[in-house]
């Protein structure tokens, strides 16, 4: 910027001189961040952008850009994570601040079941395990346990029976689905005979 200095003495004589004034902005922006909570999606992933954590960052000359790091999260990041918001003004001054990013998994397992047929044994009993009903249930963050509403069957259960499979993931999210267990009794009756003597 060019400015002109004009000086007038007591006798009215005037003299002027031009000078260059260089204006610099060395003031960093004010970076302000907020803590947030995000949910993983069904694939076990989540991402954020600077606007998600920015809480009114500002600069007198204007903000040129913002970045946040890290900005992608997965099952290994569950819980509290520290992220850094970097704010750059139009004159390339930067400022940083941190926020807490809490990552949660609220997605229930994806359920796939199958119907099965089982046979009673010679004692009229049969039992199953969850893996016989499960047909590929999955969860992005891993499965912790499988459970069935009914494991044991007897003669009173011959025919179609509805059982419920419960799958719980590593973060306590549970889902259920039904399947049909058909119980069959194909064991022939045991016939016992004895010889007898009769008198005419």
Show which residues each predicted segment covers.
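Proline-threonine-serine-rich low-complexity tracts
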Residues: 1-200
């Amino acid at each position: 910027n060019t400015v002109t200095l004009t000086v007038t003495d007591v006798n009215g004589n005037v003299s002027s001189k031009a000078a260059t004034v260089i204006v610099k902005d060395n003031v960093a922006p004010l970076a302000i961040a907020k803590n947030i909570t995000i949910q993983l999606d069904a694939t076990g992933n989540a991402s954020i952008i600077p606007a998600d954590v920015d809480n009114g960052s500002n600069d007198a000359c204007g903000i040129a850009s913002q970045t946040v790091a890290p900005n992608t999260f997965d099952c290994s990041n569950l819980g509290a994570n520290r992220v850094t918001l970097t704010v750059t003004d139009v004159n390339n001054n930067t400022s940083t601040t941190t926020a807490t990013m809490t990552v949660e998994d609220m997605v229930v397992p994806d359920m796939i079941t199958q119907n099965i047929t089982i046979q009673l044994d010679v004692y009229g009993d049969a039992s199953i395990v969850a893996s016989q009903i499960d047909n590929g249930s999955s969860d992005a963050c891993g499965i912790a346990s499988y459970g069935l509403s009914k494991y044991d069957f007897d003669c009173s259960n011959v025919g179609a029976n509805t059982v419920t499979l419960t799958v719980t993931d590593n973060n306590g999210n549970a889902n259920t689905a039904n399947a049909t267990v058909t119980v069959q009794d194909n064991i022939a009756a045991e016939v016992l005979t004895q010889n007898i003597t009769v008198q005419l």
